[in-house]
Amino acid sequence: MPMPPDDSALSLLPDHPLAAHNTFGIDATARFAARVTHAAQFAALHRDPRVAHLSQLVLGGGSNVVFTRDFDGVVLLDEIAGRRVVREDDDAWYVEAGGGETWHAFVAWTLEHGMPGLENLALIPGTVGAAPIQNIGAYGLEMKTYFDSLVAVELATGRSERFDAARCAFGYRDSFFKREGRGRFAIVAVTFRLPKRWTPRLGYADVTRELDARGIAPDAATPRDVFDAVVAIRRAKLPDPLELGNAGSFFKNPVIDAAQFDALRARVPDVVSYPQPGGQVKLAAGWLIDRCGWKGRTLGAAAVHDRQALVLVNRGGATGADVLALARAIQDDVRKQFGVELEPEPVCV
């Protein structure tokens, strides 16, 4: 009788090119790569003598990474699939997705199955497993709002752990997995709590303008209307990584205290800002970069997108060093002109 397949077996791909595995399209090579389709493969890594001693990098869609050099270790390509409703009660559905699921496809699937809530996060690149690391957000919604829990494998021990929101310690484009837990875990499944009573989030003018252009009053908008509007806005503003390499918004919108904001507004009365809890103020990083004259400018083979100053692009053949040099030049100018620090969103490897 043939033996059943071993779900923990890992097939290594030596000298694996990474350009197709990062949305910037940066040419780098991994000493090894491996496609991971089962959580058991992550759990068995620490016992595999071929890779246990090597540096390990879990990669989803590669939409939040800048490769600055070849990776002398094993890149673990998270392709764990699956979407299901794990349970429901009178108030909500609890929906689980595999870490390797494409985020946008998952959002579309929830809508198709009558479970709205995530539509403001449509078309954000990357995978479900990467979403909690960054606490992705757009158009007035952060992922943490509907997050329930996740399952992650600690790579050094193979132990599976469940994390609730408190353990994830979500912040603005931040989480435990981007700080203390960076590089230690592989997220294999994420569960979301989607309320059965839908609450539209239409606080951003871009969304209401797009709805208006479609002849839809905000109070009459359906979840599908909001989804379609967000998709249209993102496609109009952001370049397709398949056509022009990029990682979406490259910098976080900086958050400053009230005293710093008052001093800045005294010098720059038209500065774009958004009040935050606790008296803090969020600034529009794209506006700051544009005001410094960077929109459309190039440095080496990297450039600032000509329609969205928050997006850095690969004009063809850009290296990670090109992208970082451009980012640092922008940071220097914004610091000199506004006294504000810009923090990159992508992780540099």
UniProtKB/Swiss-Prot annotation:
Which cofactors are named for this entry? FAD
Q: Which reaction does it catalyse?
A: UDP-N-acetyl-alpha-D-muramate + NADP(+) = UDP-N-acetyl-3-O-(1-carboxyvinyl)-alpha-D-glucosamine + NADPH + H(+)
Q: Where in the cell is it found?
A: Cytoplasm
Enzyme Commission (EC) number: 1.3.1.98
Q: Which SUPFAM superfamilies does this entry report, sorted A to Z?
A: FAD-binding/transporter-associated domain-like (SSF56176), Uridine diphospho-N-Acetylenolpyruvylglucosamine reductase, MurB, C-terminal domain (SSF56194)
Catalytic residues in the record: R173, S249 (proton donor), E345
For biological process, the GO terms are: cell division; cell wall organization; peptidoglycan biosynthetic process; regulation of cell shape
Predominantly, its location class is cytoplasm
Q: Where are the transmembrane segments?
A: none
UniProt entry tagged with the keyword Oxidoreductase:
yes
Q: Which residues form a coiled coil?
A: none
Q: Write down any Gene Ontology CC term.
A: cytosol
Q: Which InterPro entries match?
A: FAD-bd_PCMH, FAD-bd_PCMH-like_sf, FAD-bd_PCMH_sub1, FAD-bd_PCMH_sub2, MurB, MurB_C, MurB_C_sf, Oxid_FAD_bind_N
Give the matching Gene3D superfamilies. 3.30.465.10, UDP-N-acetylenolpyruvoylglucosamine reductase, C-terminal domain, Uridine Diphospho-n-acetylenolpyruvylglucosamine Reductase, domain 2
- Residue limits of the FAD-binding PCMH-type domain? 24-197
Keyword list, A-Z: Cell cycle, Cell division, Cell shape, Cell wall biogenesis/degradation, Cytoplasm, FAD, Flavoprotein, NADP, Oxidoreductase, Peptidoglycan synthesis
UniProt family annotation: Belongs to the MurB family.
For this protein, the record's NCBIfam families field holds:
murB, PRK00046.1, PRK13903.1
- Its recorded name reads UDP-N-acetylenolpyruvoylglucosamine reductase
Species: Burkholderia ambifaria (strain MC40-6)
